[in-house]
């Protein structure tokens, strides 16, 4: 027998042996084997760094997606020996396209509009938030290396990086979704990603009333407060709906006013025409060039604003915000992390002290009492629902003291058979001190909305 014939027969035997080995794999093992094989061939034949749908516009994205999907389908068709049916092959194609073009196992969650947050706790655990509840998914990364590759895909288009010398970073996806990344040595479980997804459809007041976040009477009162240029502080915990409520309040600002919004990460979407949106700037790779919120607040005062809307007060900018409210820039809006209206006042006092001011605490509280008119307290309840749990008026008293008078509050009564919160919005039977001002301005707001209870 000729040598060429023996080589040919041996190759055929090896192919048959390989086929037999593959057919013994479980469907999941076969999928993993196929993905690894195709991914390796893609690495050998193409420059995958050029393929990133998150750096493309929509038309380029669709063209690239179609091209790459076709390439992968052709490569898979050549692997006829693997025991996968049509649906399984299609699933493998989609997963490979997501890995090659996008953010791997995160892509399907980014496409799902019902998901509000994505949380990656190392390569083996991916959580999602739906309707205010957190769920562990069965998705995972194949390795820490794949997870770090996805992180690089997020950061490299915007000129950011994360490594041991700079192990945490904030970023934003092209669709506006906020991203936080933290890696070892700060994270002890491996790389961690938190993505707060950008919501394409903004909830309006009708949506919030329908969802039971507040009553129509509460909305009407807040609308009047905005028109009267009352300074409003939205207080609440993480994920309690502060930004959503701030968007709603901002929608009540008259069209003919010049509005300056200031945020760490742009989330506010005002519909008015005359809006200037400012965003703080983090330091560059060398740790230089940062422009914090406080500097933007100071600069906004030179921009002839009718209203200043600060996405969130976290530090020394609270002093400049209060001074703006007390010096003619009334009608301003902002949010703060706090668990109650009283706690919000304490937090504001602490933040002003963080600004390095030499003002005594009594003087700071006097500024707060004269600057803040209304506090709206939000909360995320145990069933995942978000509600306005209090609307309170801040009433200045003498010697730096103030009274926090509740006007509306949510009374929780228990849970139903589906473990949903049962409760009612109640009114405290007290008129706001500026009710006469409402009548003088000719605004329609009945005294009755402060008297009778409304069940939901």
Predicted regions and their residues:
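N-terminal anchoring/assembly modules that precede and organize ATP-driven motor systems
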Residues: 1-135
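Active-site phosphate-binding and catalytic loops of NTP-dependent enzymes
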Residues: 51-53, 78-85, 101-112, 154-171, ...
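P-loop NTP-binding catalytic core
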Residues: 112, 120, 125-228
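AAA+ ATPase "lid" subdomain C-terminal helix
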Residues: 180-182, 374-384, 397
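Switch/coupling sub-region of P-loop NTPases
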Residues: 219-235, 244, 248-371, 377-379
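Conserved glycine(s) of the Walker
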Residues: 241
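NTP-binding/hydrolysis catalytic cores, primarily Walker-type P-loop NTPases
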Residues: 384-456
């Amino acid at each position: 027998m000729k040598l060429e014939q023996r080589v040919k027969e041996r190759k055929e035997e090896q192919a048959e042996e390989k086929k037999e080995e593959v057919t013994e794999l479980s469907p999941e093992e076969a999928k993993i084997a196929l993905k690894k094989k195709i991914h390796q061939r893609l690495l050998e034949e193409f420059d995958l760094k050029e393929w990133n749908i998150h750096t493309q516009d929509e038309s380029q994205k669709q063209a690239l997606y179609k091209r790459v999907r076709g390439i992968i389908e052709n490569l898979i068709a050549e692997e006829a020996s693997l025991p996968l049916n049509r649906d399984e092959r299609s699933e493998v194609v989609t997963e490979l396209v997501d890995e090659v073009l996008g953010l791997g196992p995160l892509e399907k969650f980014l496409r799902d509009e019902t998901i509000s947050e994505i949380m990656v706790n190392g390569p083996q655990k991916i959580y999602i938030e739906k309707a205010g509840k957190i769920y562990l998914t069965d998705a995972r990364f194949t390795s820490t290396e794949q997870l770090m590759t996805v992180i690089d895909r997020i950061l490299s288009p915007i000129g950011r990086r994360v490594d041991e010398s700079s192990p945490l970073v904030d970023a934003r996806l092209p669709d506006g979704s906020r991203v936080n990344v933290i890696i070892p040595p700060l994270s002890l479980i491996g790389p961690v990603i938190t993505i707060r997804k950008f919501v394409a459809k903004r909830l309006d007041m009708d949506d919030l009333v329908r969802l039971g976040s507040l009553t129509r009477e509460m909305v009407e009162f807040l609308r009047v407060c905005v028109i009267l240029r009352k300074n409003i502080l939205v207080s609440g915990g993480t994920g309690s709906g502060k930004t959503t409520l701030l968007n709603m309040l901002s929608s009540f600002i008259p069209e003919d006013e010049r509005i300056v919004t200031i945020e760490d990460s742009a989330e506010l979407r005002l519909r008015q025409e005359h809006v200037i949106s400012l965003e703080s700037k983090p330091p560059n790779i060398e740790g230089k060039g940062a422009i914090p919120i406080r500097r933007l607040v100071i600069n906004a005062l030179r921009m002839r604003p009718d209203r200043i809307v600060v996405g969130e007060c976290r530090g020394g900018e609270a002093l400049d915000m209060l001074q703006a409210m007390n010096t003619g820039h009334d009608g301003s809006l902002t949010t703060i992390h706090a668990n109650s209206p009283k706690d919000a006042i304490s937090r504001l006092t602490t933040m002003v002290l963080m600004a390095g001011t030499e003002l005594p605490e009594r003087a700071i509280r006097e500024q707060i009492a004269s600057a803040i008119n209304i506090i709206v307290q939000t909360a995320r309840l145990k069933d995942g629902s978000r509600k306005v749990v209090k609307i309170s008026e801040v009433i200045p008293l003498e010697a730096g003291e103030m009274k926090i008078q509740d006007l509306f509050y949510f009374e929780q009564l228990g849970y139903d058979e589906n473990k949903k919160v049962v409760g009612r919005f109640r009114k405290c039977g007290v008129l706001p001190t500026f009710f006469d001002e409402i009548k003088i301005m000719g605004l329609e707001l009945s005294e009755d909305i402060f008297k009778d209870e409304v069940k939901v």
